[in-house]
């Protein structure tokens, strides 16, 4: 009997050892990219893989929201937990849609939080006073108080993030790529210079270029109206940008009709500077001319009023863009004027770049500006703008914006959020990625249509 028990124990021990060895072997087969709960070999099933990615993001958001809620309960606001994308959400480039380098999006890197910057930046934007004291007294004053109270009518899926967080930059590039956007126009101030509510951001450019290159995106520069901007310091700043960043593989160049590939610079509020000053920089006879030099480029002026057309010609600019996402707000942003603007540009050999946006609402920072709010209508407003832009057969289209949250023009993912004082807008009944999906749809349509009319208009096609 004892021998039988001993034999049984030996067999049982060998069986347990076999099961343990089998489990260890299966564990070794599990792919490195699998997240918790992901069965091994899931990458072989793309549809399941994508579904798991989506669920993983939902889990991360719920976790982040719970952390923020607990933080508020304890009144601890010194640290913001920035949501990290899971490894499973890193898609292969082969799984992403083709790029459209004729579709640009305006991108802002001015956000900050305590975790990466020691304080909140831009999320705590002040409420701006109306210039008429009689109107101003009817509205609240002060600053927003993140993370639950931010200077936006929508709430980001990533929370009140920092533009310095590498994982945030990575997520942004992935979202742009998923939307078939080829070029981001980076809001830019010279080194050690910043907007009145921010901090210097030029030191972020190398990381943004590197992350963009990972997704085969290109970066162009949207030069902001820094203090005392003129022909001389513009020359120095253009030289700085090209010398420092021009050799990076993600640095954007546009191939002109003559076959030259030149850097492109959007110049915000260009009308502030007199045409004579611009002509010093942008005409061949100018005293600070960049023309036919290593620092030559394509300079795109912001057209607000109709009269700016002739100032732009006199200045020597290479094209115009309209920026504002509010149809009817300015002459340039009004869809009905785009056809005539395109004819004007064709006549004078200028590049016409209409700017489209998903909507507009800035009442979180300008509560008195309700007349310029444009409802998104579940994506219809955006599609109307894109359709109007395509009808003009433009050389390029710009999107306002990827993440200008203060003015509610973002196509970045937003989520529902409610606090005791605020109910944020969101994209429901659609998913947080609605505007990325719509952008992808129209990018593909634009790419096909542009290929058909490019030869007739002698536009570059590569």
UniProtKB/Swiss-Prot annotation:
GO terms for cellular component: Golgi membrane. It is a single-pass type II membrane protein. InterPro entries: Glyco_Hydrolase_99. Its main location: Golgi. It catalyses: N-{alpha-Glc-(1->3)-alpha-Man-(1->2)-alpha-Man-(1->2)-alpha-Man-(1->3)-[alpha-Man-(1->2)-alpha-Man-(1->3)-[alpha-Man-(1->2)-alpha-Man-(1->6)]-alpha-Man-(1->6)]-beta-Man-(1->4)-beta-GlcNAc-(1->4)-beta-GlcNAc}-L-asparaginyl-[protein] + H2O = alpha-D-glucosyl-(1->3)-D-mannopyranose + N(4)-{alpha-D-Man-(1->2)-alpha-D-Man-(1->3)-[alpha-D-Man-(1->2)-alpha-D-Man-(1->3)-[alpha-D-Man-(1->2)-alpha-D-Man-(1->6)]-alpha-D-Man-(1->6)]-beta-D-Man-(1->4)-beta-D-GlaNAc-(1->4)-beta-D-GlcNAc}-L-asparaginyl-[protein] (N-glucan mannose isomer 8A1,2,3B1,2). Residues 1-8 are cytoplasmic. One of its GO terms (molecular function) is glycoprotein endo-alpha-1,2-mannosidase activity. The keyword Hydrolase applies. The chain crosses the membrane at residues 9-29. Keywords: Golgi apparatus, Hydrolase, Membrane, Signal-anchor, Transmembrane, Transmembrane helix. It holds the Pfam family Glyco_hydro_99. Residues 30-462 are lumenal. It is found in: Golgi apparatus membrane. Its EC number is 3.2.1.130. Residues 60-462 are annotated as: Catalytic. Undergoes proteolytic cleavage in the C-terminal region. Belongs to the glycosyl hydrolase 99 family. This is Glycoprotein endo-alpha-1,2-mannosidase. The lineage of its organism: Eukaryota, Metazoa, Chordata, Craniata, Vertebrata.
